[in-house]
Amino acid sequence: MNGSRAWRLAAWLLLCLSCSAAVARKDSCETCTKLVERFHKGLENTAKKNFGGGNTAWEEKTLSKYESSEIRLVEIIENICDSSDFECNHMVEEHEEQIEKWWFKMKQKYPDLLKWFCIEAIKVCCPSGSYGPDCLACLGGSERPCHGNGFCSGDGTRSGDGSCRCKAEYTGSFCLECSDGYYSSERNDTHAVCIACNQACKTCNGPSNEDCKECNNGWVKDDGKCVDLNECASEESPCKDSQYCLNTEGSFLCKECDGSCSGCSGEGPESCKDCATGFVMLSGKCTDVDECDASEKLCLRENEVCLNTAGSYKCTCSEGFEDKEGNCVKIMETENPEITEGETGTPASDTNILNTAHEDL
């Protein structure tokens, strides 16, 4: 392996190790934070489990012994992690002595378990507004990371680089500049408020369409302000022949013509340019032609009638007839008389003989 290739491989391995360590530090802080939350939940559960019986004097006397007892700590720790949560169980096992130390010796002086355990004792988290192995202040300061307009990378963890991920309205390293589509209503060295431009503006320096620096798509400059461009007014429609154009603010919609139309300028049969097959123009709108009223008979089979439909017609068998092999034939009722209860199908003469024989016995 030549020297250049070996150097690149070493640099790649170093980068991978660095990334893995950063992820591990972030995950460790998340695990510790969750562990502390579960610990506080355990405090609530053990308090409810052992008290609240109504004997206040007895509870106060007993509580003073139980609330900081080893028994209570064991009950909490036994239920602090799910059995499948490897990271949580590993952290408890690795740092159980620290938890016991806080419980028996440090709790009164340092009541904030997250701060004492996660930040100061095992050093997997940072105070809010700081980041990285040394808990450096985020850009903009730990009190208002990213000047309150974004999120600090690694905030509260031992990972990240402290850079700002700005909210949609803001941009820049410190989240003090306004993004396209927003203008600055307040601004100083440490504070900025960005408000959305008028919908007509792509960029602006104020709230109205007269304050646009550049118009958004679908708007054009007219007399110093951005106004809606009516795409539907162009000579060539942006829609298909079977659709009409409907202008909207900054855009347009293509909507299907009425079924009676062959091309249209708007909604309904009165907006047809031409009528579709099966329709004729009457009183300014396309109306269905009733082909069944024509003098020439359209349905020629015996026992067949004509039914008008929108824009057409269909031939169907008359009531009481059905189509069989191209002919309308009468529907035959099936003869299937029901056998009444008690009937056996035995001939009457035989039945009488049987009855007679039975009577003779």
UniProtKB/Swiss-Prot annotation:
Coiled coil: none
Region described as Disordered: 339-361
InterPro entries linked to this entry: DUF3456 (IPR021852), EGF-like_Ca-bd_dom (IPR001881), EGF-like_dom (IPR000742), EGF-type_Asp/Asn_hydroxyl_site (IPR000152), EGF_Ca-bd_CS (IPR018097), Furin_repeat (IPR006212), Growth_fac_rcpt_cys_sf (IPR009030), LE_dom (IPR002049)
Ranges of Polar residues composition bias in the record: 346-355
FU repeat coordinates: 191-238, 251-298
GO molecular function annotation: calcium ion binding
Disulfide bonds: C138-C152, C146-C164, C166-C175, C292-C306, C299-C315, C317-C328
Primary localization: secreted
Leader peptide range in chain numbering: 1-24
Keyword Secreted carried by entry: yes
Annotated protein name in UniProt: Cysteine-rich with EGF-like domain protein 2-B
Gene designation: creld2-b
